[in-house]
Amino acid sequence: MQQLAELYPQHISELQSRTKEALSREGIDGLIIHSGQAKRMFLDDNNYPFKCNPQFKAWLPVIDNPNCWLIVNGSDKPKLIFYRPKDFWHKVPPEPNDFWVEQFDVVLLTQADAVEKHLPYDRSRFAYIGEYIEVAKALGFDLVNPDRVLNYLHYQRAYKTDYELVCMRQANALAVAGHNAAAAAFKAGKSEFDINQAYLAAVRQSDNQVPYNNIVALNENSAILHYMEQDVVAPSESRSFLIDAGASFHGYAADITRTYCNGSIPNSSHFAELINGMHQVTLSLADSLKPGVPYSDIHIAAHAQVAQLLHQFDIVNLSPDDILAEQIVSTFFPHGIGHFLGLQVHDVAGHVADDRGTPNPPPAEHPFLRTTRMIEARQVFTIEPGLYFIDSLLADLKSTEKSKFINWDVVDTFRPFGGIRIEDNIIVHRDKNENMTRDLGLN
């Protein structure tokens, strides 16, 4: 894409600037960033699927090649040691020739264990950034993943460059195509397994290429927050469908959730109305993302709006304010309202107050909130309110004095549908918000 090529030099310039500041804080000369290496399964000769170091893929869209290295110091042209072995067992990556190549001095590495000759001779003033501590020690690095460096780099990752925003829009476009295909498969009565296959075919990515394991849940399975099973047999009656699934583009993630209802099923009209109500909650909360507002305030607002739904649909026989006062909402909405999104699905530095890593934990009453940062321009968030009928949490509630406030007959009519989550991906700009998910056609 020409747009990526035009924006990429500024992206590298920003990473150089961040690197220079991180190095000055640690008092060192440079970073050696390791893409990672193949990891063998225990007592086996097969490897786990390769997952690239996010600090490596922040620099360039090489996300599937182990044994690569970057040498960066914030001033000189970054050096890329690109692994290209002689190998007749596996596909060998081609020599780099994409839009990003001119930003690097590229050296080809044919043997993974021969990297030492390409690294700085005196590594005492360089820090290794990566997962493989034993490799770092064998190569003579004393400084490994220093906190001051990572705290600063992680904090700054919340602010996306124009190049990164284009990548994230493209990831959303891919995911939207997948969600549309999955919705069609649900309407055709397909199994969870077949719905997932339809999704993957539409995004043109495998299970190992999408940014996380897709959640594809029919009926009561929609009440399991991280349901991963994917039954191969379609149920005799497909009442509801929740899909939480994303896509990757150049290492950046989309993370989208939708819930659907089969309108031909008895008692489905109220659940369909509840889904529509949750769409309005998502849109309202997305509009509330403003620079200068703590993200935790969005979560508190989500609880208030879910309380309104619990009252409106006669699930709880209390006013919304009293539902909040009795702390009933968390039974039906037990997770956080969202998180940072970027190179990682749950992107880093959500629980810090500054670029030195000062902790800023979530409130005790909302322990699962993944982000407590102040909202600022160029940050990207998910907004994902939900309302679920989870047997274990409902049983806990029923054993308390608060049970008398619950209309259990209504709860029981909703249980077969499982639950609802509606999740959009939002870019916060200085004077507006950009709902990538909706703008790209998924309503």
Curated annotation (Swiss-Prot):
The terms describing its cellular component in GO are:
cytosol
Q: What SUPFAM superfamilies does UniProt report for this protein, alphabetically?
A: Creatinase/aminopeptidase
> GO terms for molecular function, please?
aminopeptidase activity; metal ion binding; metalloexopeptidase activity; phosphoric triester hydrolase activity; proline dipeptidase activity
State the top-level EC class.
hydrolase
Keywords of this entry: Dipeptidase, Hydrolase, Manganese, Metal-binding, Metalloprotease, Protease
Share an example GO biological-process annotation for this protein. Answer: proteolysis
Q: Which cofactor does it need?
A: Mn(2+)
Q: What is its EC number?
A: 3.4.13.9
Query: What's noted on cofactor binding?
Result: Binds 2 manganese ions per subunit.
- Residues at which Mn(2+) 1 binds: D255, H339, E384, E423
UniProt catalytic activity: Xaa-L-Pro dipeptide + H2O = an L-alpha-amino acid + L-proline
Report which superkingdom the organism of origin falls in: Bacteria
Q: List residues binding Mn(2+) 2.
A: D244, D255, E423
Tell me the function of this protein.
Answer: Splits dipeptides with a prolyl residue in the C-terminal position.
Q: What NCBIfam families does its record include?
A: PRK13607.1
UniProt lists the family membership as follows: Belongs to the peptidase M24B family. Bacterial-type prolidase subfamily.
The molecule here is called Xaa-Pro dipeptidase
Q: Which organism is it from?
A: Pseudoalteromonas atlantica (strain T6c / ATCC BAA-1087)
Question: What gene name does this entry carry?
Answer: pepQ
